[in-house]
Amino acid sequence: AKPAKRVAVTGAAGQIAYSLL
């Protein structure tokens, strides 16, 4: 579980959630 990968996934999810808002 590389931190960079987790950040990338979180960032993508955040962008999607923001778009839905």
Curated annotation (Swiss-Prot):
What's one GO MF term for it? L-malate dehydrogenase (NAD+) activity
Top-level taxon: Bacteria
UniProt: NAD(+) binding residues: 11-17
Q: What is its EC number?
A: 1.1.1.37
Q: Which reaction does it catalyse?
A: (S)-malate + NAD(+) = oxaloacetate + NADH + H(+)
Going by the UniProt record, its keywords in alphabetical order are: NAD, Oxidoreductase, Tricarboxylic acid cycle
GO BP terms: namely: tricarboxylic acid cycle
Record keywords: NAD included? yes
Q: Which family does it belong to?
A: Belongs to the LDH/MDH superfamily. MDH type 2 family.
Query: Main role?
Result: Catalyzes the reversible oxidation of malate to oxaloacetate.
Q: What is this protein called?
A: Malate dehydrogenase
